[in-house]
Regions:
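Membrane-interfacial helix-loop-helix
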Residues: 1-22, 51-128, 132-144, 157-167
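Transmembrane alpha-helix interface/packing and boundary motifs in multi-pass membrane proteins
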Residues: 21-41, 115-116
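Short helix-loop boundary/capping segments at the starts of domains
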Residues: 31, 50-51
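Re-entrant/interfacial helical elements at transmembrane boundaries that shape
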Residues: 33-47, 125-133
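Central hydrophobic cores of alpha-helical transmembrane segments
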Residues: 38, 144-146
Length: 167
């Protein structure tokens, strides 16, 4: 699969930033993030950096923007479908567990955003769950900007570190 992406980007250099944005968004959003691996995003970023298709700061900024918009979209998706989801028979049977989880998220919501950004398995799920919880959008937004900034720094280190090993 990555060979196809690599070939596409080699033939369409001007679309490299769109590919980075798209993969960053998809790996962060609840509906696609469960399927799209962050390894694809990292591989695309490393390829674009090694082929010098974009400067490093552009790669990182576009990836951060895509990730942030994916997180915010997941948060508001949770706000939108959360009440309906919580009213389902399946969820209502687990009311005690749901209340405990909501209490935990209400206490630790902002920290959960930052932690979730660095754990690929839960990355797309955390914003959605926080959208269902009572966390205010402004608190989520600020925490997510901090999380995506820290993640962008880590992405810079990953891209340059792996890039120097390969190239």
């Amino acid at each position: 699969m990555f060979e196809n992406i690599e070939s596409f980007l080699s033939n369409n250099n001007e679309l490299a930033w769109i590919a980075i944005f798209m993969f960053a968004f998809m790996e962060s959003f609840i509906l696609s993030g469960i399927i799209v691996s962050s390894a694809i995003l990292f591989s695309v970023c490393i390829f674009v950096f090694n082929m010098e298709l974009l400067p490093l700061y552009t790669i990182v900024m576009v990836a951060m923007l895509g990730a942030h918009l994916g997180d915010v979209s997941g948060f508001f998706f949770g706000k939108t479908v959360g009440p309906t989801l919580l009213a389902t028979k399946f969820i209502s049977k687990r009311e005690k567990t749901i209340k405990r989880a909501q209490k935990f998220l209400d206490k630790t919501g902002q920290y959960t955003v930052i932690l979730g950004r660095f754990v690929p398995a839960i990355r797309p799920i955390v914003p959605f769950l926080l959208g269902i919880s009572d966390l205010k959008a402004v608190r989520f937004y600020i925490a997510d900007v901090v999380a995506c900034t820290c993640w962008g720094i880590a992405l810079t280190l990953l891209v340059t570190g792996v890039g120097s090993l390969i190239g």
